[in-house]
Regions:
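Active-site-adjacent beta->alpha loops and helix N-cap segments on the catalytic face
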Residues: 134-143
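Amphipathic helical "hinge" segments at domain boundaries
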Residues: 39-43, 51-126, 204-207, 223
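Short hydrophobic/charged patches on amphipathic alpha-helices used for structural packing
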Residues: 60, 113-116, 139, 176, ...
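Short beta->alpha connector loops
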Residues: 107-110, 130-135, 255
């Protein structure tokens, strides 16, 4: 005998069981309007809805409100340890407001616009982007589409979109100041790709910090990506470039620093006895490599949270308190840096 499906629980059923009006239940279960409901009534309605197994009709809600309570997130490389905590922050902020997060990993920048067009077709309410290059046409594409959007971890240098970022220049100043305090004078930089704002900002931070200390301009090798392999290649180029070997190397991120470790070990050079190394990001496990990496710690989860909160403010028609939110980095000193050996 075929089992009969139980009748679908409606918003009217929740209202009757809660002893409140249907409109009260509607507001209580709408993330955009629930702030108008008292805490006691909100808890009562939510508990009743859970007990009865009520599932809101998202399609009907979207038709009524013009919102799907879904946001999109574009990431360049989900395997990069920087991005999972950023995504966690975005998801936490979204969950607190009853939003669903639609994530796309965009490994190839050429795919960004087609993916974004697909998200727009799904009627997302807004977008958090961590993928934009410098002078990226994607930013104009987003703006022309009329979509609410916020950048995270990378800022648009022209200010076309709001952003939540860390202070890349300050981060590099902290690393350089630490090395100079140890006695280093010949400091090199394995720079991030100059096609992305973070690569440019960190390079400028190193250059300015050395000028502030009245030290020679750094020897710079640009990495073609933020990867361990790129760090290996850049470190080889630096060692083969001739002249006096640098006493210390400021790396644009931790993966690049680990690539530098590989090449220095293969060359028979010791860290930090022969050369000091600093990273950037404080990704998981860099405190367990040999030697543990001195690096810059960033509030990645908070970056994600802030970006999402800025997006929700825009979606709800609120004025942003700032077009760019800048969070402060922190130096974490470990065993990969020490005073230089006597010349």
């Amino acid at each position: 005998m075929k089992a009969t499906k139980p009748p679908k629980v409606t918003i009217r059923d929740v209202a009757t069981a809660s002893g409140v009006h249907v409109s009260t239940v509607s507001r209580a279960l709408d993330p955009a309007r629930r702030k108008r409901i008292s805490k006691e009534v909100l808890e009562l309605v939510e508990e009743t809805a859970r007990r009865l197994g009520y599932q809101p009709n998202r399609a009907a809600s979207a038709l009524r409100t013009g919102r799907t309570h879904t946001i999109g997130v574009l990431l360049p490389d989900i395997t990069n340890p920087v991005f999972p905590p950023i995504l966690q922050g975005i998801e936490a902020a979204a969950a607190a407001r009853g939003y669903f997060v639609f994530v796309a990993n965009v490994g190839d920048p050429q795919l960004a616009q087609p993916i974004l067009a697909r998200m727009k077709a799904q009627q997302i309410d807004g977008l958090v982007m961590a993928i934009a290059l410098r002078e990226d046409p994607l930013i104009d594409f987003v703006r022309d589409s009329g979509m609410h959007a916020v950048m995270v971890n990378r800022a648009d240098e022209s200010g076309r979109l709001p952003a939540a970022v860390s202070d890349d220049r300050l981060a590099m100043k902290l690393a350089v100041d630490h090395l100079v305090a140890l006695g280093h004078r010949r400091i090199a930089h394995l720079a991030g790709p100059q096609t992305v704002p973070t690569g440019v900002g960190r390079r400028q931070g190193v250059e300015q910090a050395l000028r502030d200390h009245r030290l020679p301009a750094p020897r710079i090798v640009e990495c073609d990506s933020y990867s361990r392999e790129a760090g290996q290649q850049a470190m080889r180029v630096l060692l083969e470039s001739g002249g006096k070997r640098p006493q210390a190397v400021v790396c644009c991120n931790d993966l690049v620093a680990l690539g530098a470790y590989d090449v220095l070990r293969a060359a028979g050079l010791r860290i930090p006895q022969d050369i000091s190394i600093t990273g950037h990001n404080d990704m998981p496990l860099v405190d367990m490599v040999d030697p543990p990496l001195t690096t810059i710690r960033l509030p990645h989860r908070e970056l994600g949270w802030q970006a999402a909160e800025m997006l929700f403010q825009a979606i709800e028609g609120q004025s942003l308190l700032a077009s760019t939110v800048v969070l402060r980095p922190e130096l974490v000193v470990r065993a990969s840096t020490a005073a230089p050996a006597a010349a």
